[in-house]
Amino acid sequence: MPSHRNSNLKFCTVCASNNNRSMESHKVLQEAGYNVSSYGTGSAVRLPGLSIDKPNVYSFGTPYNDIYNDLLSQSADRYKSNGLLQMLDRNRRLKKAPEKWQESTKVFDFVFTCEERCFDAVCEDLMNRGGKLNKIVHVINVDIKDDDENAKIGSKAILELADMLNDKIEQCEKDDIPFEDCIMDILTEWQSSHSQLPSLYAPSYY
């Protein structure tokens, strides 16, 4: 654990529906004392339904509490046994509703995506915004399988990476070295301990 977690650093976690992987990482980073937001890049929020061919689909912005109550009315037993109700209960304690990345106006220092298509969507969206602020953002993908167990494993690994980045920024400021010159070393060191979580990196701009 770092001696000082800088709450001025702005972190963001992103998955497809802003319900499982991004929200578990949101929770873990927030509990560690970091400034964190979370988003989804999908066209809608999709959660498993009562049959494989009929997922539950909601618009971004639909409160987690409303989704929870909808699933509760469909089948409390089914959605409790597959963990969806517990997941939504966690989510509604963190924020009101799933948010869509493409509608976000916040500016972040680091964006952690949880699968490659989300990484691509974030990078493409930032490129389309045109980089008018000339503010660098480090987009890092950590490939996490979309289930409860892997979301928990992935979130701990993301916290570890956030701590390493946090410490390196502090060290670079003391030594008057550009952080951008050091980030690949951090990612390489982190990846060597997490071979089961393939990562990607792209610097982008707001």
Swiss-Prot record:
Enzymatic reactions: O-phospho-L-seryl-[protein] + H2O = L-seryl-[protein] + phosphate; O-phospho-L-threonyl-[protein] + H2O = L-threonyl-[protein] + phosphate
Chief location of this protein within or outside the cell: nucleus
Catalytic activity, EC: 3.1.3.16
InterPro entries: RNA_pol_II_suA (IPR006811)
Classification via Pfam families: Ssu72
Gene Ontology annotations of biological process type: mRNA 3'-end processing; sno(s)RNA transcription; termination of RNA polymerase II transcription; termination of RNA polymerase II transcription, exosome-dependent; termination of RNA polymerase II transcription, poly(A)-coupled; transcription antitermination; transcription elongation by RNA polymerase II; transcription initiation at RNA polymerase II promoter
Highest rank taxon of the organism: Eukaryota
GO molecular function, one term: phosphoprotein phosphatase activity
Subcellular location, record wording: Nucleus
Keywords on record: Hydrolase, mRNA processing, Nucleus, Protein phosphatase
Gene Ontology CC, one term: mRNA cleavage and polyadenylation specificity factor complex
Quaternary state and interactors: Component of the cleavage and polyadenylation factor (CPF) complex, which is composed of PTI1, SYC1, SSU72, GLC7, MPE1, REF2, PFS2, PTA1, YSH1/BRR5, SWD2, CFT2/YDH1, YTH1, CFT1/YHH1, FIP1 and PAP1. Component of the APT complex, which is a subcomplex of CPF, and is composed of PTI1, SYC1, SSU72, GLC7, REF2, PTA1 and SWD2.
Function: Component of the cleavage and polyadenylation factor (CPF) complex, which plays a key role in polyadenylation-dependent pre-mRNA 3'-end formation and cooperates with cleavage factors including the CFIA complex and NAB4/CFIB. Component of the APT complex, which may be involved in polyadenylation-independent transcript 3'-end formation. SSU72 is required for 3'-end formation of snoRNAs.
Similarity annotation: Belongs to the SSU72 phosphatase family.
Protein name: RNA polymerase II subunit A C-terminal domain phosphatase SSU72
Encoding gene, per UniProt annotation: SSU72
